[in-house]
Amino acid sequence: MLKDYFKLKENGTSVRIEALAGLTTFATMAYIIFVQPVVLGAAGMDAGAVFTSTCLITAFATVLMAFLANYPVAVAPAMGHNFFFAYVVVLTMKIPWQVALGAVFLSGIVFVATASFGLREMIVASVPDSLKSAIAVGIGLLITLIGMEWAGIVRLDPNTFVTLGNLSSKPVLIALLGLGTTIILIARRVNGAILIGILVGAVAGLFTGIVKNPGSVLSVPPSVLPTAFQLDVWTALKQNLIAVILIFFFLDLFDTVGSLIGIAKQAGLMKEGKLPRAGRALLADAIGTVGSALSGNTTMVSYIESAAGVAVGGRTGLAALVTAGMFVIAMFFSPIVQMISGGLAVQEVINVEGQQIARTFTLYPVTSPALIVVGSLMIRSVRDIDWNDFTEALPAFLTLIVMPLTFSITDGIAFGFISYALLKVVTGRGREAHWLIYLFAILFIARYAVPGLH
């Protein structure tokens, strides 16, 4: 039955190959179940509930992808979007996480509408490639900076903003070991390199006492109720969070389209330059985001790590089905996840204008290497920016540099859109920009100019 439904013979594959592909994809993306509880935990959400939610919603959305689109693609909470949710919307904008979940839900509804009514092509085409690439690079730089800080490799400094951390301390050495392991394995093209790096750091942490022994390996999954159905949609609408909702939507749309096209090209699924069943694939992602908000999680995207499964022969949704099954199984290993994603409180004394001030901060030596590596992989998009055209290069540069400097993805996108529209107009090339660019530039200017909107 599965052979016929997923058309294994027509796609030149088998149950064994699809199973191997599904396991490979899981190994390459399993780091999200360790990282997501830490990121959303920083926003005040229950880490155990986030862990269970991550496993459940990933399995749900990936099953949708398998049956709706028959693609070997896994869908999970997006790296980058989770940091926008926690560090920008909740911690910087001071919006309660329940309201932020409401914004995620609304962005998912917008995504469902565009996927259902065929508006995605116009929206994707409206944003120039240089800005799309710069957004990915900027998010990558921000994630890398946070990863470096979590590792203790760099630390905040009142005089220079950031400075080098204590590289001889145990937590930093554990982080460097995990980072070095991951980098070497990626260079050697080993599948699951990020996951292996996390596990190496965890084992080293156990031996050095940095990581606490969990006591057990298996347990009943933590309850999802502390975060499930806690979203506040009404307040998200009242608080004028249109910019936040649209940014969630755009990030989701761009990431998903980019990942699907990249994976489809590798798998040979493109036909005459087009992706068959693209609407169904986007709908699976969009429904996943709606479900994610309901379960207490962030926007969902098609994971580019699915390309690892494609590389070993995955061609159909059966591979995605296997990946989904692995995330369900992972729920029962919560003691291991809690051990790995736990933070370590560190105290230090810093000099501020001649005064000695003690401060406490939290390091995540086991999971931080994953952020640094994922961030570095996102920066590869910088090669797609046209650096020879100043009207393309400057907006792209402002986009990618403002994000890490302000810890704000929103401000980076705003600077990029405003400067892009301005430069195209003053150089007499206004027709090169889509009318949506000008609309968003005006909205972003109003956001800064009108009190209460920023």
Residue ranges of model-derived segments:
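Helix-loop-helix junctions within the multi-pass membrane cores of secondary transporters/permeases
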Residues: 2-36, 57-58, 78-87, 91-136, ...
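Hydrophobic alpha-helical transmembrane segments
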Residues: 1-7, 47-54, 74-86, 187-197, ...
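Membrane-embedded alpha-helical modules
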Residues: 93-203, 207, 321-454
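Conserved, well-structured core segments that form the ligand-binding/active-site neighborhood
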Residues: 72, 202, 206, 313
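Transmembrane alpha-helix interface/packing and boundary motifs in multi-pass membrane proteins
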Residues: 61-74, 183-189, 248-255, 285-295, ...
